[in-house]
């Protein structure tokens, strides 16, 4: 009989972003497959939804880029890894990845990373900081675009002993099955968001950040009205600005400029 595999995922905050929901979904999937499933994070909105009888959560300041806190995290991650007999450590962000990498060296565990975005690097120091995501035994790219980006920008950190694979992001379609959402809850949301049953609804989910394309989305809505005379719709931008107040104000200003406040 094969020994049970214990997997530890480490992420700065367990919020509503793509990396975070991926971590959440995988944690519960692992538990369903009779694997030991563990998460280390500092905080996050999704924590209250974690099924504690299936997934064990530890709170550590893994969101911090402070070198002293990173060293602190190395020590405590090493203890967690040993005490819980962790086999695989999966880091989903750069700051905690440094702690995970060194903790895995100490405990001789398998280190895995997921490269979630095109991290900025304006200097060699920043590029070195980003390179931690490629110091694992396996680096996962979430798309062909990210895969090509890694090969193009970080080729010097790749070698035959390090695996780079594309694993596309999936979703749990049960979340979006209308049958799983009560009529009462549906009506409550419609009332809170002032949604009409008689209008075509367009939803754009995602963090409010310029490269997600919310500005283009708003401009496209204006084109629907001005060029195609399509007016019977309502649109929703759903996501956190994560402190990007200037960008949020820019979007609101754009909505007003195109007279879309009632849309």
Residue ranges: model-predicted function:
Residues 177-195, 250-253:
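A short helix/loop element that forms part of the nucleotide-sugar donor recognition site in Leloir-type
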Residues 91-97, 115:
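Short His-centered aromatic/hydrophobic patch
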Residues 20-25, 200-226, 249:
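A conserved mid-protein helix/loop that constitutes part of the nucleotide-sugar donor-binding site
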Residues 56, 239, 248-263:
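Nucleotide-activated donor-binding/catalytic signature segment of Leloir-type glycosyltransferases, i.e.
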Residues 68-75, 110-112, 117-136, 148-157:
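Nucleotide-sugar donor phosphate/pyrophosphate-binding loop at the beta->alpha transition
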Residues 39-45, 171, 205, 234-249:
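Glycosyltransferase donor-sugar binding loop
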Residues 136-178:
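A short, active-site helix/loop in glycosyltransferases that binds the activated sugar's phosphate group
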Residues 4, 9-17, 21-68, 155-163, ...:
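N-terminal strand-loop element at the rim of the active site
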């Amino acid at each position: 009989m094969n020994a049970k595999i214990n997997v530890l995922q480490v992420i700065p905050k367990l919020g509503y972003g793509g990396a975070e929901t991926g971590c959440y979904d995988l944690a519960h999937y692992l538990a369903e497959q009779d694997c030991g499933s563990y998460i280390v994070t500092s905080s996050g909105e999704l924590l209250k939804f974690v099924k504690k009888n299936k997934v064990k959560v530890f709170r550590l300041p893994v969101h911090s880029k402070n070198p002293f806190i990173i060293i602190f995290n190395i020590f405590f991650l090493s203890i967690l890894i040993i005490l819980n007999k962790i086999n695989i450590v999966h880091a989903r962000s750069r700051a905690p990845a440094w702690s995970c990498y060194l903790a895995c060296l100490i405990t001789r565990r398998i280190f895995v990373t997921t490269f979630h975005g095109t991290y900025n690097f304006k200097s060699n120091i920043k590029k070195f900081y980003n390179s931690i995501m490629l110091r694992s035994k396996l680096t996962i790219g979430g798309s062909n675009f990210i895969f090509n980006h890694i090969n193009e920008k970080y080729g010097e950190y790749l070698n035959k002993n390090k695996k780079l694979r594309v694993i596309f992001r999936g979703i749990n379609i049960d979340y979006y099955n209308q049958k799983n959402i009560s009529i009462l809850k549906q009506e409550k949301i419609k009332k809170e968001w002032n949604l009409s049953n008689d209008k075509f609804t367009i939803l754009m989910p995602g963090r409010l950040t310029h490269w997600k394309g919310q500005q283009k989305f708003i401009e496209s809505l204006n084109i629907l009205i001005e060029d195609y005379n399509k007016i019977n719709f309502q649109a929703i931008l759903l996501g956190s600005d994560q402190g990007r107040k200037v960008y949020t104000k820019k979007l609101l200003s754009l909505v007003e400029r195109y007279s879309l406040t009632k849309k």
